[in-house]
């Protein structure tokens, strides 16, 4: 499976993410072992990193954060998410499609 995968039915993007919490800034770093490495400033405490990741991705894709689905990895750094019908495809992610 690729780090970023276009899904036709239902329409959207599936992301495999390696999360780096408590980073100095929010950014998409690049590929890390066939996953998209995402650095965020939120700490990995009481689900704060997951909530912040969803908020960060919702801004990038211009979708409501409630529409993004965390499919796997709620308590791990390795996560799989589904972004339904993104309104914008960020250039940092477009290159990995």
From Swiss-Prot:
Alphabetical list of InterPro entries matching this protein: DUF167, YggU-like_sf
Entry GO terms, CC: cytoplasm
SUPFAM superfamilies: YggU-like
Disulphide bridges: none
Gene3D superfamilies associated with the record: YggU-like (3.30.1200.10)
Family, per entry: Belongs to the UPF0235 family.
Annotated protein name in UniProt: UPF0235 protein HD_0778
Organism: Haemophilus ducreyi (strain 35000HP / ATCC 700724)
Lineage, top ranks: Bacteria, Pseudomonadati, Pseudomonadota, Gammaproteobacteria, Pasteurellales
């Amino acid at each position: 499976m690729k780090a970023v995968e276009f899904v036709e039915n239902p329409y959207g993007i599936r992301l495999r993410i390696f999360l780096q919490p408590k980073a100095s800034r929010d950014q998409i770093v690049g590929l890390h072992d066939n996953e998209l490495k995402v650095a965020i400033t939120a700490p990995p405490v009481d689900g704060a990193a997951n909530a912040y990741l969803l908020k960060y991705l919702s801004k990038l894709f211009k979708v409501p954060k409630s529409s993004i689905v965390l499919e796997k990895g709620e308590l791990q750094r390795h996560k799989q998410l589904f972004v339904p019908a993104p309104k914008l495809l960020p250039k940092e992610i477009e290159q990995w499609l």
